[in-house]
Amino acid sequence: MSLFGTSPEDSSAGNSAHRSKSSLFADEPSLGTGSNANLGSSSLFADDDDLSSGSPWNSNVNKRTARHKLVKTLLSDSDAPESYIDAYDLVLSAGDRVGAGIGLTSVREILSGSGISASDQEKILNIVVSGDIDSANGLGRGEFNVLLALVGLAQEGEDLTLDAVDDRRKKLPAPKSLYLDALRANQESGTPAPSQERPITPPRPASPQQAPNSAHSRRESMTGLESDPWGSPELHRGHAHAQLESDHPVLNGYGSVRSATNAWSSRVGEDNNPNEISNSNRANSQTDSAPSHGSGFGWGESLGNTPSDGGLGGTARAGLGGFGPPSSVHSDSNPRRRSLGIGRVASPPVEEHVTVTLLPEKEGMFMFQHRNYEVKSARRGSTVVRRYSDFVWLLDCLQKRYPFRQLPLLPPKRLSADSNAFLEKRRRGLVRFTNALVRHPVLSQEQLVIMFLTVPTELSVWRKQATISVQDEFTGRDLPPDLEDSLPSTLPDTFETVRGGVKRSAEIYINLCTLLERLAKRNEGLAADHLRFSLALQSLTEVTRDTYAIDTNDVPLLNEGIRATANHLSVSQSLLEDEARAWEEGVLEDLKRQRDCLVSVREMFDRRDRYARNNIPQLERRIENNERKLQDLRSRPQGTVKPGEIEKVEDAIIKDKESIVQQHARGVFIKECIRDEIVYFQQSQYHISRLHQEWSQERVKYAELQADNWRSLSDQVESMPLSG
């Protein structure tokens, strides 16, 4: 007997008779062979008829997976004609991008504009789009080539099978589609490509809770920057960047470097600058912000207070346990826009934004090729090309120089063959990494980061020419006399409390990201099934007159209602696909940003355990031994002590005491640094609030659009005949 009930053998024997019965609603597939199989049952609703074998290796899922792989590899770029390749690039540039491929909306437009019958459209869709297999990544070049080949075969009256495509491999047909012709005409005339048809119903009156301003759609924000979901705002050109003082030592190439602690002042000064942008262009503009150059020290300076006020300066917020920035600093945001005109509840100041675009061409010798990324900063007015290894080198340098800072995370490196889905995920990870750097008040002022974002030459060449410093940020700094007393005595307990909460929260957010990815993929699969349903209904209208041939008077009204249902299913498919895309580019990236933030804080505490150690107790014991030895040497009769031995012991004592002072000062600096990082991390809670507000508004908008779509269908099918 099994731990969870009847064993598989007993269950199979006990249910064999039940499986052999012919049931009208026998939806369950046959799992047996011979007498135990219901192969002979004429089940009207047995949808999984492919499961004709009891072997688990012959399941329907495995067959679909195998066919999907065949479709992807049947027509490679070398086999496809140039017209197929140009058509794919044309559709991709039109903006209907899902993952690294094209979406179902473009597939529907190509099929509907080809002039083939609805039944042929349905058959082609079922061949090319294999249900939930990789649906979230769109159609790649391989699937698109097969799609065009099947459309061409249908227009020539050939069989619609993969074998027919393979037989015509050397002479593939040239399909005709009004949609592709329109895209080509727009490209030749230089006019913008027509946006994909999104069924937009008349908006409802805005409720009092909604914000007065509404953002543009995500797709509109993507088209200007090669469909990058992190589209950089077009900032003003006259931005005056902060000038670095020339009396500081030159580090990391050229220019002068302010101390890491003073860098907080200029950064927070920018964030606190009043935002005087109108609501209409708030998401696409930037205000000039002059960094403050006060004479204060450390975090206190960044808050506009002197260290004499103690701690972080001024009156601390009660919610931060005696240290924290004023409320004006809490508006750190990422003003990304939601699709389909979702309004924002609040309009925080626009911050610097960096876009990362994957370049299509590989570089390097065979077997050692690599991908390049275009890194563009609108505020800095810079565009550079970097490799993934350049990002790795930058993070390695920052870990050596700023081990006790909240360093952003890099996406992992993949050694196996690159896939479009992986490359797109890594590109988005690089976007999060780069923008986390430019948001950080200290790391954004580091010369390595500035040079990484602005040096136009190849980074490996610049590294050979520049003088790069990766010394610990506390090296050479003197401890201010009042800094140690200004730190709260409960700081260690606060560190442990925050560390425990961050560890648990990071695990939860990792799980949330996985769940939301699954939800988005399910939405993509649901959209594909809606399109299949729509094409099946359209093909049904072709045979309705023959089906009811005795009296065809009501057939036109019947077909009109069926076509209305098919059209509204197509509208629903577009909405589902657009919503899934909005999730992947919006709330999913927001969750991943918060996840990366939590994991980076967790790793900061782990690095503190490894690198914040000292040997002060050992030095104190050694000083005591040397002092006793020195007294013994001085008490000896003159002439019995070797020359220079007393001076040697004295020098050892002095060096040990200096080392104790330096290590103690470093420990204080580490406490202050981690305290500052926790205060900076405190702002992420407001990002969580915006995340939930924007996602809820987005869900409401799509729910209203779907409801309006089905309400319109209900009105249109009222005229369908109900009786003779």
Swiss-Prot record:
It holds the Pfam family PX. Gene3D superfamilies: Arfaptin homology (AH) domain/BAR domain (1.20.1270.60), EF-hand (1.10.238.10), Phox-like domain (3.30.1520.10). InterPro entries: AH/BAR_dom_sf, PX_dom, PX_dom_sf, SNX8/Mvp1, SNX8/Mvp1_PX, Snx8_BAR_dom. The keyword Metal-binding does not apply. Residues 1-17, 272-292 have a biased composition (Polar residues). Transmembrane segments: none annotated. Belongs to the sorting nexin family. This is Sorting nexin mvp1. It comes from Aspergillus oryzae (strain ATCC 42149 / RIB 40).
